[in-house]
Amino acid sequence: MQIAPAIAQNQHNLILFVPDGLRPLSVTPEAAPTLVAIRDKGVNFSNPHALFPTFTMANASGMATGHFLGDTGAFSNTIYTAYPVPTAGGSVTPFIENDPILGDIDAHFSGNFVDEDTILFAARRQGFSTAAIGKLGPTLMFDHTERTGEATVTIDDSTGSKQGIPLSQEMQDALKAAGLPLVAPSRKDTPGDNSNAGNFEKPGTLVANVVQQKYFADVAAKVVLPMFKRRNKPFVLVFWSRDPDGTQHNQGDSHLKVLPGINGPTSLASIKNADDNLADLRRALDALGLTATTDIVVAADHGFSTISKESKTSPAAQASYTDVPTGLLPPGFLAIDIAKALALPLYDPDDKNKVVEAGKHSSRGNGLIGSDPEKPAVVVAANGGSNLIYVPDKDAGRTAKIIDALLAQDYVSGLFVDGDIGTFAGTLPLSSINMQGKARTPRPAIVVNFRSYATDCGQPAASVADTALQQGQGMHG
């Protein structure tokens, strides 16, 4: 479909800027002057909230389609697919912030696993130029069925590699003309290594994701926006900033301590980093004469909390591990506790279904529970501040046993249960969080929300998290 020149001239452009994991109270004149200016001079929605579970891919699917998770099926960052995903090493619990994995899941579920049109797909059908730039995973979600690189420009962590979406010849030529590489930098390329998450003995990164995000901002400002102006058509550009999320996850300011948590200098630097990227885009619009015809929408996908690994009731926390401080919850504690409550074996879906022995935990926190890992009675998809539990055969008795075990744990805050399985005391239905829909992917039987509590810090949120990250680092969910 072609838009008439007069319509094209009057049509506004759109930039959706997503500062991943930005907390509203973090937007201050010191840390984020560009965001403050947009908030104070534009329209400010002062009471926003994320889709729950509050994970990147879940909220990306909502932003991209306008549908709730019950329809999109992107229930979290890690989901149960009920089939071995080849590009995830044969795991049935893939982490879906990954271009090849998204392609595999799309192919398995009739070519479009979310079963909805995305905004970039709809925009380009109406004659708009379209681009998605930024963090691996959510960036592709905005036009995930377009994998040629010809119809929508897609630039993320994998750009220039075999795993990435190809660059069109037009984009290759434009990048070269701007003096920009055809291969995206990695998080390791920032001196100090932003990808360093540390471990229980060593703290994580002390630097923001500057180099990689500067590349993304330069691609948008110096290549994509000028290209779109030359086309003389309206455009939609999605810019998904990994910071502050990536840095708040990995920061080493608060190793094993909940204070200052994610309120330290490295987290503040990550907020400034995202703000700098937005400033680059605004300057480019000014220079290109596009400011008056371009609307900028800023929307974080979720907030953030400081990780707590404390529990006085968890059997998993009472065991000893070689890589976990004594008395703290290990990664995969939920799967360990459920397997113990059901007196069933636990297997690791991300390590060729190997049995998880006493004093060990699964490699990524996920778990297959039952006598046969190929036909699990229960599946746990570990995500962080909340987890997904699947009961593939929807057995109400087994579900009730799991619920009883969870309600006895001090780390549980809320339980949401599939209404098709039944109604259980002390729980809420999945429909109350819009997770009961027509999703193509398997629907969780239970969503477990972990305990959160106040600390003495300026932004006093700490949350129990099922993650390989350490107490004092950052999480959401």
Tell me what each language-model feature is.
Residues L69-T72, R147-D189, V258-D276, A316-A358:
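Acidic, His- and aromatic-enriched active-site or binding-groove loops in soluble protein domains
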Residues H67-F68, A74-S254, V380-A381, G385-V391, ...:
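His/Asp/Glu-rich, glycine-adjacent segments
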